[in-house]
Amino acid sequence: GSEMCIRDRYESKGYIEPFEKFNVHPSSYIQGIGDTIGEWRRKALDNLRNLELVKSESYLNIMEEGLGILNELDYPDALTGGLRRYADNARGIIERTRSEFCTILNKQMSLTNTAVKEKTLAIVKKYPINVKQ
């Protein structure tokens, strides 16, 4: 469905294509974005487990971009099949992912390995979040 198309196109092109590029009803696109955010969370967490912080960050960023798209869409709720619910759910998923990302960054910052600390600091500086430096 839409989730697979959105995800696959992102994986091949590196960005979320606009609604007009898909031959689907607006509610299918919205549902696809919402569902794909959950899939990107899984990928972000998989990369976190492997300490692939840059890859994990890229999935967090695309999740936020997906939420931005959901927030920009302005269709009546009857057409969208519950846009607000999808946006609220996506927001919660992103906040949990960001929290887990910050937890790992904090753990990495506590390491004595200078190379790891420098790499982690470069990521930390991008986020206006509560990460101990």
Regions found by a protein language model. Name each.
Residues R9, D46, N50, E72, ...:
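Heptad-repeat coiled-coil alpha-helices
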Residues G82-Q133:
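C-terminal accessory extensions/subdomains outside the catalytic/core fold
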Residues G1-I6:
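Short, small-residue-biased leader/transition segments that mark boundaries at the very start
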Residues H25-Y59, M63-G66, L70:
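Surface-exposed interaction/gating patches
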Residues D46, S58, E65, E72, ...:
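Charged/polar, solvent-exposed surface patches and flexible loops
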Residues Y10-F22, W40-R42:
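Short, charged/polar, low-complexity loop and linker segments
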Residues N23, K55-N61, L111-K119:
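Long amphipathic alpha-helical coiled-coil segments
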